[in-house]
Amino acid sequence: MSIFRITNILVSVLAVGFLLTGCVSKEKSAERLYQVLEKVVKAEKEFEEQQEPLVALEKEEKEIYNQIMALGMKQHEEIVKLSDDALSIIDKRRDHLQKEIDSINDSKTEFKKAEEIKNEIKDSAQKRKADDLFEIMRNRYKVHKQLAKEYSSALDSDKDLYLMLKNESISYDKLEAHVTRLNTTYQKVYDANEEFNELTAQYNEKKLEFYKEAGLNLEK
């Protein structure tokens, strides 16, 4: 019964600097929008900091699961000990997930301020670039919400799995059926992860395009 784990790190939005000296922005609102959009980056700093610890914990838990699968049921005491270790890791993963969610929510709050400024833009070319940018970010937030939901569901199923493994009388068929369902959930997590990273890459690209269209003198 192999178990599926995602090991991809979620990509964060990138900070971009520009030189105020010699800035040839067509509108002051572009400079104001820049300031707020870069606050969105800062709001996601904690989100970014959760990625490597989460992946490390996922790998650690996978190793524990493999150790359990290598043991016979006669070694029940060792299985219980390893399952408890895995349950502790699941709690840590849940803590990191909550910090990630909180950080994305802070990002949303800042982004709403940016939307108010965007609506003040008069230049049609800038407006088109900004509209594209904001549509991508709204989709990104939507995908992360779904991703977090699926990941939380996977954590619940992970917990159930190790509780089942601690039960000496659990049948192989029940374990196998549970692992199959769990892997289906993790496939959903993986798919949402991929979509989120793609949207983040698009957002970072469109943000640069907007800054250039607005005449902001970007730092190299």
Which residues are covered by each model-predicted region?
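Short amphipathic alpha-helical segments with heptad-repeat character
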Residues: 41, 48, 55, 94, ...
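Immediate post-signal-peptide N-terminus of mature secreted/exported proteins
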Residues: 24-98, 212, 219
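Extracytoplasmic/luminal low-complexity segments enriched in Pro/Gly and acidic/polar residues
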Residues: 188-220
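C-terminal motif of bacterial Sec signal peptides marking the signal peptidase cleavage site
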Residues: 19-22
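Bacterial N-terminal signal peptides that target proteins for export
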Residues: 2-10
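Extended amphipathic alpha-helical interaction segments
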Residues: 100-182, 189, 209-216
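Register-specific recognition of a single heptad position within extended alpha-helical repeats
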Residues: 27, 31-34, 38-41, 45, ...
